[in-house]
Structure formats: structure tokens, C-alpha cells
């Protein structure tokens, strides 16, 4: 399976910098270790014998990025990453070439006592309860959730339909529709969601929003499959 990394370095001085990228699970594999002369670096490499990620087998690797200047460590970042492929073939949703049935629920950040102030322990309890009842998918109705939710879904194994914060319930027959005054705001919400969450293996589908009026532009979105609730 191919792994592609886009790295952007925010620094005024670009000289004498070296970037090292490592993939770690049972063993370490160096993906990249070179001097760089640009603030944006693209790395593409082939990974053999990958253990794929699914809700039943949530195999995660750790990617470590290390920045050196004059061979002295400057800064590092690490994050979990799962390898999986999604596609629709003859109307069947496949993950890693195998048909998947989504047995999912809509989930709000809510607690009978704490209200909308959800802490990490409460969120993890939600996920554990869902897994114990054979739920394998979550729709983040009706907004992107805290980053912690996606980390939990990566780790425990739940598929996620990630929903943009776009809803005009009650006035959806005329807002936002094709009103160009709303276009930049709508695009901004979707783009920020995708940029933030695209590296999570659990996210298998993007939702454009919930009950926000179907527009002509939505019929020409150049992606294989989309979700827009209520329209």
C-alpha cells in the first residue's frame, strides 16, 4: 500500500534542516531522512505487508516526524495512522476489498447530567458501550466532533461519517440553496473539517451537512459518493 505524506514546516530559517519520518508498529521503518530546502515536502513511499485497519481489526501504526537543524533535534510530532481503502463497487460499499454493513447511530455530544460539556471519560464510555452492543458506525450529527472522538474510533474500531457543521433546519427550503452569499462560509466549514480529520482511518465518508436545502452545486461535486441528510 502507498503512503503519502505532505509536511509543512513553519520556520523563517530553512537552511541546515533535516526531516526524518518513521513508521512504527512491531518494528521501525524509516520513510524519509534527508536534508530539506523547502517549507513544504511531499513524501510517497510503498509499504509492504501492511496490516489493514477495519472496525473489526483496528490496526494502528505510529508515524513519527522529527526535525533537526545542524543535526540537533528541534521538534517532533507523532500520530496514529491506519491503512484502509474505501470504494463502492456495483453498489456495494467495500473496505479493504471486503463488503461492509454499517450498523450505526447518530451521536450528539450530550449527557443527562453534564449536558453538552462532555469530558474524555464520558466520551470513551459512550464508545465502549456502542462496541459492546455491536454498533460499528457513528454519524457525527450534526457537526464535527472533538478530536478525541476520532482518536477513540481509530483505537476501538468504529466507522465514522464525518458531518460538516451546516444545518438550516426549519428554513431549509430556501436557505442556503444556491444563494452565493453563503458559498464561502459553506465551503470553509467543509474544507476545515476535511483538513483536520482526513488522516483518521475511522473516517470512511464525509457528510456535507444536515437538512440544509439541496442545491444545484451539490449535484456536481467531483467525489465518488457523498451524504447530505434530509435532502
What are these language model-derived features?
Residues 1-152, 156-160, 188-189, 204-205, ...:
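Secreted/periplasmic carbohydrate-active enzymes, especially glycoside hydrolases
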Residues 56, 163, 211:
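Acidic-residue sensor for enzyme active/binding pockets
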Residues 103-108, 163-180, 186, 190, ...:
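Aromatic- and acidic-residue-enriched carbohydrate-binding clefts of CAZyme catalytic domains
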Residues 130, 167, 198-200:
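Short, flexible turn/loop "capping" segments at secondary-structure junctions
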Residues 144-145, 166-168, 210-214:
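Solvent-exposed loop/turn segments at secondary-structure junctions
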Residues 148-149, 169-172, 215-217:
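Extracytoplasmic/secreted cell-surface and envelope-processing proteins
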Residues 156-158, 178-181:
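Short, hinge-like loop/turn segments at secondary-structure boundaries
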Residues 182-228:
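Active-site neighborhood of glycoside hydrolase catalytic domains
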